């Protein structure tokens, strides 16, 4: 699997749909997807890879596949966009949350849906993002992409 295309991800009914390049056949890119669930480990499709079992030659097509499957089979239907405050930095996915005036985050590296976030609370979203960016900037990156 190539890196997860977090910068292309979309949020849909309590899931984050994350496309990635599955393969290339005759110069044609084939996309698949992985999911994160707002319910985390309680969600049936948390960290699932392409539960629909279909692929597409476009990112929009793979979103259609994922959304159709989630609409038919998901156990999570959330009107709240749990993934609203998501950012990519150096191809890492950062999701910032607020609860009772405190901020915390989830951090996923470019090739894995294992949360590597430090257990730390912040006074503001900006403090949280600055701390994460400073930590990531300490290490050289083979690929640079900053959208924080």
Stretches with model-predicted labels:
Residues 40-61, 110-127:
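A short, exposed loop/beta-hairpin motif centered on an aromatic-Gly-Thr core
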Residues 1, 143-148:
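Short intrinsically disordered terminal tails
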């Amino acid at each position: 699997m190539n890196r997860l295309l977090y910068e292309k991800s979309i949020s849909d009914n309590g899931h984050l749909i994350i496309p990635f390049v599955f393969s290339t056949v005759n110069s044609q890119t084939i996309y698949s997807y992985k999911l994160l669930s707002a319910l985390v480990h309680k969600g049936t499709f948390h960290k699932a890879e392409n539960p629909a079992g279909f692929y597409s030659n476009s990112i929009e097509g793979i979103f259609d596949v994922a959304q159709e499957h989630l609409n038919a089979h998901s156990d999570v239907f959330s009107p709240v966009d749990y993934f609203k405050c998501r950012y990519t930095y150096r191809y890492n996915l950062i999701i910032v949350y607020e609860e009772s005036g405190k901020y915390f985050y989830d951090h996923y590296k470019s090739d894995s849906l294992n949360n590597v976030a430090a257990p730390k609370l912040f006074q503001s979203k900006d403090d949280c993002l600055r701390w994460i960016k400073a930590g990531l900037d300490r290490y050289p990156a083979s690929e640079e992409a900053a959208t924080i």
